[in-house]
Amino acid sequence: MEIIRGFAPAEKRLSRRDKAGFFLDETQRAELAKRLGVDPEKAVNGIIDDIRKQGDKAVLEYTLKFDRAAISKLEVSPAEIKQAAGEIPAELFEALKLAATQVRAYHHFQKEAVWKAAEIMQGKQLIRPLERVGLYVPGGKAFYPSTVLMTAIPAKEAGVDEIILVTPPGADGKIPAPTLAAAYIAGVDKVFACGGAQAVAALAFGTKSIPKVDKICGPGNIFVTLAKKAVFGVVDIDGLQGPSEVLILADQYANAEYCASDILAQAEHDVLASPIMVTTSAELAKRVNDIVETKAGSCARKDIIRQSLRDNGLIAVVDNMDEAIKLANMYATEHLCLLVKDSEQYLSRINHAGCIFYGEKASVVMGDYVAGPSHALPTSGTARFSSPLNILDFVKYIDIVNVSKEEVTKLGKAAVTIARAEGLECHAEAALKRME
């Protein structure tokens, strides 16, 4: 990993974050298109257009083209979903159930807090769950049952009427049993074997098989993300997720093995993942780097890890915790790990992060699977203005206005004055009628 010293060099290096293609200028976009062999935005727009015109037929054709899966139907039957729950190892099934319990409890607690606030606003505002939500779960060569739980359960707790899940099938045309088992545990209503931009388009516009949804949530590759960006406005989306990232703040008291294990876990995600550590200890920086370099070669995904560390890994050594926290807030990371003495005292100084892990035992991996909050977090600096996926993503607020006879004269007079100042005489007349 690259080790740099000093606040200014670290700030400059961290500001060069890869935006994964959806915030790039024309030159950067051209470079990305050359690397991928296709202009991703043009490809996505073409796919969306095909889905709008041809529906299921186009979805099936793209599933064959991109996933090499020759399937004749998109929907997975309820019987297949239930059957999958009995096919996976008992230990995995119990682990998924425990994770589901944790996620459900966390979001139920949040729901109670939100509904309590709504009671205070009684007569002023209504809360209504979205009717139908589409969840995108990455798949194909790998499978992510944890993402099913982390997206479906908050939607379920919020009261969404119908939860639709899309995920790419393998080359055999099937969705992995752990993914289906997680859908069963989470209470997903329908599952469709399709992925990529074509699945996003199908959710946004609807096909004969796949119903149109009100909102699309869940992470994916650059094509999925650009498709979500393109259909925003037709439907709502949770955000534009880029490559996964962690920033570890560590002082001289930090356990070097813990720091190294979290860095390796982050690098294991994919070659675009960003494992970052900012420390006040040059000695710790060297120890952590030595451990990472030694262990990386023995990991199952060593090639991915090494490329991630080479291209995006960084250890920055700064003078004090003030500088470290300033860098953390500037970077606005997806995962922020506080491996420092008395870590709780620094929580009030963190303004921008998707999720904060403090205390030695709070590994990011716990948040990935079993801590309770959703692991669907803002990335690429969007933690400066957005939040983790939660029940508020699956409800909407409706304001209520009622004006009493006692209020209408005072309020109406002001309304008439403002309406006439804006040159809207009919507005003024409507207010005057209520004042008669």
UniProtKB/Swiss-Prot annotation:
Keywords: Amino-acid biosynthesis, Histidine biosynthesis, Metal-binding, NAD, Oxidoreductase, Zinc. One of its GO terms (cellular component) is cytosol. Its EC number is 1.1.1.23. One of its GO terms (biological process) is L-histidine biosynthetic process. NAD(+) binds at Y136, Q198, N221. The keyword Endoplasmic reticulum does not apply. Its cofactor is Zn(2+). InterPro entries: Ald_DH/histidinol_DH, Histidinol_DH_CS, Histidinol_DH_monofunct, Hstdl_DH. Zn(2+) binds at Q266, H269, D368, H427. Gene3D superfamilies: 1.20.5.1300, Nitrogenase molybdenum iron protein domain (3.40.50.1980). It comes from the Bacteria. Substrate binds at S244, Q266, H269, H335, D368, E422, H427. Binds 1 zinc ion per subunit. Pathway: Amino-acid biosynthesis; L-histidine biosynthesis; L-histidine from 5-phospho-alpha-D-ribose 1-diphosphate: step 9/9. The active site is at E334, H335. One of its GO terms (molecular function) is zinc ion binding. It holds the Pfam family Histidinol_dh. It catalyses: L-histidinol + 2 NAD(+) + H2O = L-histidine + 2 NADH + 3 H(+). Catalyzes the sequential NAD-dependent oxidations of L-histidinol to L-histidinaldehyde and then to L-histidine. Belongs to the histidinol dehydrogenase family. HAMAP family: HisD. This is Histidinol dehydrogenase. The gene is hisD.
